[in-house]
């Protein structure tokens, strides 16, 4: 597998609508204010987080169970700045909608701006022929409240192209998160 360049990413967007909307250069300023960057980079794409968040809460005294997940574990917010409580967790989603080619696997890494503040972003790999908004998991590892800025960069996606096309893609096996829109909770 090889990591793909900005040139390849642009071509995949033009020919296959791989990322929508797409910023073909790094955006660092919006309305004359500095923001956390997003857009195309040398070997990846920095995606933005939308203003939809689900923040973990303990007000209902429930247990987090990935096999039987309860929405009572979360508080929904549509905000420009999401405040994650100390040592807590929030879900968001990318503004961008992704359509992954059959011979590509995508991995996500966090942005150093957030990592240096103790905020970790986690996403499982985007598999061949998966498509949808990416649900982002934000962990606040600090003992203080932490901010996530909607409509700004949140993570970077790296595109790995295989020398062989897979026998079975995510679409072929009808993966449960196929074509997800919005923040998607755990499914079993």
Swiss-Prot record:
Gene3D superfamilies: 2.70.40.10
Annotated pathway: Pyrimidine metabolism; dUMP biosynthesis; dUMP from dCTP (dUTP route): step 1/2
Reaction it catalyzes: dCTP + H2O + H(+) = dUTP + NH4(+)
Binding annotation for dCTP: 111-116, 135-137, 156, 170, 179-180
Hydrolase keyword on record: yes
GO MF terms held by the record: dCTP deaminase activity; nucleotide binding
Gene Ontology BP term (one): dUMP biosynthetic process
Enzyme Commission no: 3.5.4.13
Keywords, sorted A to Z: Hydrolase, Nucleotide metabolism, Nucleotide-binding
Active site (record annotation): 137
Coiled-coil features, chain-numbered ranges: none
InterPro entries named in the record: dCTP_deaminase, dUTPase-like_sf, dUTPase_trimeric
Listed HAMAP family: dCTP_deaminase
Subunit-structure text: Homotrimer.
Purpose: Catalyzes the deamination of dCTP to dUTP.
Entry similarity comment: Belongs to the dCTP deaminase family.
Protein name, as recorded: dCTP deaminase
The organism of origin for this protein: Rickettsia rickettsii (strain Sheila Smith)
């Amino acid at each position: 597998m090889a990591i793909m360049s900005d040139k390849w990413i642009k071509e995949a967007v033009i020919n296959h609508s791989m990322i929508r909307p797409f910023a073909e250069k790094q955006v660092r300023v919006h309305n004359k204010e500095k923001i956390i960057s997003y857009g195309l980079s040398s070997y990846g794409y920095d995606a933005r987080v939308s203003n939809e968040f689900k923040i973990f809460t303990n007000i209902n005294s429930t247990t987090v169970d990935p096999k039987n997940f309860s929405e009572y574990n979360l508080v929904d917010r549509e905000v420009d700045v999401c405040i994650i409580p100390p040592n807590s967790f929030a879900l968001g989603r990318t503004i961008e909608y992704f359509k992954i080619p059959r011979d590509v696997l995508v991995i996500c890494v966090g942005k150093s701006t957030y990592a240096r503040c103790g905020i970790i972003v986690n996403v499982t790999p985007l598999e061949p022929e998966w498509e949808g908004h990416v649900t982002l998991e934000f962990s606040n590892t600090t003992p203080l409240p932490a901010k996530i800025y909607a409509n700004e960069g949140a993570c970077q996606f790296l595109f790995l192209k295989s020398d062989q096309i897979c026998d079975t893609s995510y679409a072929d096996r009808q993966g449960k998160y196929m074509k997800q829109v919005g923040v998607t909770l755990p499914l079993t």
